[in-house]
UniProtKB/Swiss-Prot annotation:
One of its GO terms (molecular function) is monooxygenase activity. InterPro entries: FAD/NAD-bd_sf, Flavin-dep_Halogenase_NPB, Flavin_halogenase. Keywords: FAD, Flavoprotein, Monooxygenase, Oxidoreductase. Its EC number is 1.14.14.-. The lineage of its organism: Eukaryota, Amoebozoa, Evosea, Eumycetozoa, Dictyostelia. It is an enzyme of class 1 (oxidoreductase). This is Flavin-dependent halogenase chlA. Belongs to the flavin-dependent halogenase family. It comes from Dictyostelium discoideum. GO terms for biological process: culmination involved in sorocarp development; dibenzofuran metabolic process; DIF-1 biosynthetic process; slug development involved in sorocarp development; sorocarp development. It catalyses: 2,4,6-trihydroxyphenylhexan-1-one + FADH2 + chloride + O2 = (3-chloro-2,4,6-trihydroxyphenyl)hexan-1-one + FAD + 2 H2O + H(+); (3-chloro-2,4,6-trihydroxyphenyl)hexan-1-one + FADH2 + chloride + O2 = (3,5-dichloro-2,4,6-trihydroxyphenyl)hexan-1-one + FAD + 2 H2O.
Amino acid sequence: MDTNIINHYDIIIIGGGIAGLSATRHLLLKMPELSGRIAVIEPRSERRDNLDEDYKVGESTVEVSAMFFAKELELQDYLIENHPPKFSLQFHWPRELSKTDTIEDYYSTWAVKNPDIQAFQLNRCKIERDLLKMVIAQGAVYYHGRVRNVDNLDNDDMKSIDVEILSEVESGADFKLQQSIERITLTTDYIVDASGRNFTVGSRTDNILKDPKHLFGLDNASTWVRVKNTERSLFDFKSQDVTCSWTYDTNHFFGPGYWIWMIPLERGSRDYSIGVSYHRDKIQPSQLNSLDKFMSFLEKNQKLLYNLIKSGEIVDFHRWPKLAHTSKTFFSKNNWCVIGDAAAIFDPFYSTGMVMIAMEIECLTEMLKFKLSNAANDYHRRVEAFDKLIRCVTQINNHLIKDHSNHLGNASIMSWRIYFESSTYFSILLPAYIGKYHLCPIFSDHFTTDHENGLALRNQLLATLDYANENSINIGFMDNHRGGQLLGDWSPTSSWDYDHALSLAKYGHKRLNLPKCLSWSNFYLSLIICKLYYRVYGIGALWNSSFFKSLSNTTYRFSKFYFLSKLHSFNMIGTPNNDYYDKIQKDFKSYNYNQNNIVDWKY
């Protein structure tokens, strides 16, 4: 076997899945001069024609991740042409656990309108194959091989990577038939670990945290199938009360200690990813470790989904008996980082996986701009700031799953939880992303300083829901899509754009008035707290110390951010909302239309 064929690259990305390929494309789009200077190492072949190699959980994007793919990766038209649209997240609880034959047997929150920002359902096999072709065309160097060793991860010296190059196999042949051809050594100044659960860097640096004590008690697992050509009429719920599809959404079906996703993978053909995320204190992995057991579970607990799968053809079956993990370090001072599943995964609920990837990749690119231009101080400033920021963002996404085991199956408790958690996402995270605040080290410092305070407030709200759940208190059913439940027509998913960022096209860095969004987010969260505590404790809420602590927290934050919003508005005087449209208006002043001066042509 040949060994030691050495090549050097500025950046090596370990892993050619959606995280690694998205990072590669983003880096090459923002810094085209990196063509030929980025390598991708992946054990799957460049051909990618074997489904057994490419099984994935169907990935549902939300507004943040959709904007990342459409704008940052410049894939808007590609997504429209190749992947199903996504209109919303929809949630369904059985009216009676023993009767789940049709959708009318559920209490549901349905999307009521088309989304403000178009999201997509991603067929992971398809998009990874297409992204691979794109990045190779952009100048990335692809190595079909497996990483065997990495040196110098504990210092900032140049890294050395031992790679086992693999053979191609016949089209459609078993992935495991690949043979080792040779061993080569690659060197690089920076490593991006996107190797997923192989944890190429994490396993060599003691960076992975899997114990539930590091995950807010989260101990979950997952089982799923892909199915094609299902019967359309089984989930063809029609209504004259809305203006959008109820099929091209991520539908969530709930039960005690578990929830099930239903994600369309193709347009028109009714192909789905259908899987369960469950908590191991309620269901053991041994109870769902085969297709027969999974189907038996659905037949007794979610008959509608059982019938849907039985009507089609099962493509594959997969399971993860241990789902959640996180990392100690995300961006290291030793010139490596972890992204995607190699960094953290908690639960597919709320479709947060690609949101984390989007922020990780944008921070990575921003950081490496300074490293590659030899601006050492600016680079190290961002390594520290972005590592703290991403750690806080992942902790928030982890905390979103805290106590799910006890809440998921209760339609009253969980609908309330979805209601206020949707408010936080739409009023805080989405505007911050639109305004690109996450790329500012100063914002990162402020965000991370306030992080523990935010988690403490959430803990108080979860404790209130725990009390209602343990005492079987019906606190009503909240629909996160509709207005008219809190104050006027306000709703978490439709009333978030307090600064009119979409209509004014405030997409530039910090053009959007984020303090204004934070201010009004806390105002409505204060109202949510008042209504929630009254539903749980009645008039006794006035004697509840937790109520006053929570309300004083949000009231103070409302006042604080209201003042900062006025300061932001003052500082933006004279700055256009959008440079592109401002330039059009200025250029148009010289426009002069002459209807008699048609340009001649040959005829």
